[in-house]
């Protein structure tokens, strides 16, 4: 079964990636992703300067997924830019992904200008959706600000750019955000980031399980798959065909990957399950996806991608 895919001018061996934030903080972790069976990998979301992130404990595995309030810990944009530029020289045929986010409007502009002015030629993921910065609202929930920011960005940014979105829950919001995104030459939309401000409780101890924000944190894993599929489907129906979709949320097995693709995703990112299982997860997911395709008689992804049937 052929599970390869074309994306941003490159042919990838399969549709699988890590989600930024998982197993991609250090050179060692990124090298492990590069050596894995993932079709591509994205670096940790970088800020202009290194960040420690929120207080620990800030991540907790639950029976159905995870809750986290990491607070964007990272080693700074220079670290990840230098790493990807070095790989670019060593493996020029490889598709590379950076991920960036500023702490405010000005930092978002500044960090993208830094990428624009660098030697880096790969794809940049602009994170508009971190739910775990105390006192900082998610940019993408402010439609007017999102449009203003992207308008300014595309006055100078000429390299491939995608955006990572939070989950939306209202049809009117899908309509409004898609209308904004369709105005810009985006390579892709990544949907979804974790569902913000969930609460998981240890009933034996009668306390929360993570420290930041009084225990409130972003949900991942099986909890979020129906919401992720809905967002992938909604944007697949609304975005112009030039804007691809990366589906993220709730990937535990090949069936989950298949469903994201069926809803219209071109690539699929794995977060919680990668954290729990390690980079070997990609080999398992690829095998399970191929088994599903074989059972259904599909020989390539494009035979079923985006072809979810309605009743």
Swiss-Prot record:
Keywords annotated in UniProt: Cytoplasm, Flavoprotein, FMN, Oxidoreductase, Pyrimidine biosynthesis
Residues at which FMN binds: 20, 44-45, 127, 164, 192, 221, 249-250, 271-272
GO cellular component terms, A-Z: cytoplasm
Cofactor(s) this protein requires: FMN
Localization: Cytoplasm
EC number: 1.3.98.1
Enzyme class (EC, first level): oxidoreductase
InterPro entries: Aldolase_TIM (IPR013785), DHO_dehydrogenase (IPR050074), DHOD_1A (IPR033886), Dihydro_DH_chainA_dom2 (IPR023359), Dihydroorotate_DH_1 (IPR024920), Dihydroorotate_DH_1_2 (IPR012135), Dihydroorotate_DH_cat (IPR005720), Dihydroorotate_DH_CS (IPR001295)
Recorded GO MF terms: dihydroorotate dehydrogenase (fumarate) activity
List of residues binding substrate: 44, 68-72, 127, 193-194
Metabolic or biological pathway: Pyrimidine metabolism; UMP biosynthesis via de novo pathway
Gene Ontology biological-process entries: 'de novo' pyrimidine nucleobase biosynthetic process; 'de novo' UMP biosynthetic process
UniProt-listed PROSITE patterns: DHODEHASE_1
Keyword set includes Nucleotide-binding: no
Catalysis performed (reactions): (S)-dihydroorotate + fumarate = orotate + succinate
Bound cofactor: record note: Binds 1 FMN per subunit.
Protein role: Catalyzes the conversion of dihydroorotate to orotate with fumarate as the electron acceptor.
Family as reported in the entry's similarity comment: Belongs to the dihydroorotate dehydrogenase family. Type 1 subfamily.
Self-association state and partner proteins as the record states: Homodimer.
Protein name, as recorded: Probable dihydroorotate dehydrogenase A (fumarate)
Source organism of this protein record: Enterococcus faecalis (strain ATCC 700802 / V583)
């Amino acid at each position: 079964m052929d599970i390869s895919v074309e994306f941003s001018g490159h042919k990838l061996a399969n549709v699988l990636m890590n989600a930024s934030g998982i197993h991609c903080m250090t050179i060692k972790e990124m090298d492990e992703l590069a050596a894995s069976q993932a079709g591509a990998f994205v670096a940790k979301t970088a800020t202009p300067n290194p960040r420690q992130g929120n207080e620990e404990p800030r991540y907790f595995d639950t029976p159905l997924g995870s809750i986290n309030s990491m607070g964007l810990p990272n080693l700074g944009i220079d670290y990840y830019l230098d790493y990807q530029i070095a790989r670019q020289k060593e493996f020029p045929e490889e598709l590379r992904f950076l991920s960036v986010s500023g702490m405010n409007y000005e930092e978002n502009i500044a960090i993208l200008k830094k990428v624009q002015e660098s030697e880096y030629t790969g794809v940049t993921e602009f994170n508009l959706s971190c739910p775990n910065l105390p006192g900082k609202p998610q940019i993408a929930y402010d439609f007017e600000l999102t449009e203003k920011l992207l308008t300014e960005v595309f006055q100078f940014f000429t390299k491939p750019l995608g955006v990572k979105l939070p989950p939306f829950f209202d049809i009117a919001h899908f309509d409004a955000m898609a209308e904004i995104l369709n105005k810009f030459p985006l390579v892709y939309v990544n949907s979804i980031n974790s569902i913000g401000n969930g609460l998981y409780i240890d009933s034996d101890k009668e306390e929360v399980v993570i420290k930041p924000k009084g225990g409130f944190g972003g949900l991942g894993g099986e909890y979020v798959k129906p919401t992720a599929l809905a967002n992938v489907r909604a944007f697949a129906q609304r975005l112009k065909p030039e804007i691809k979709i990366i589906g993220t949320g709730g990937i535990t097995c090949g069936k989950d990957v298949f469903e994201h693709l069926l809803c219209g995703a071109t690539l699929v990112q794995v977060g919680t399950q990668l954290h729990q299982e390690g980079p070997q997860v990609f080999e398992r997911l690829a095998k399970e996806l191929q088994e599903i395709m074989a059972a259904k008689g599909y020989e390539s992804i494009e035979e079923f991608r985006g072809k979810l049937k309605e009743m």
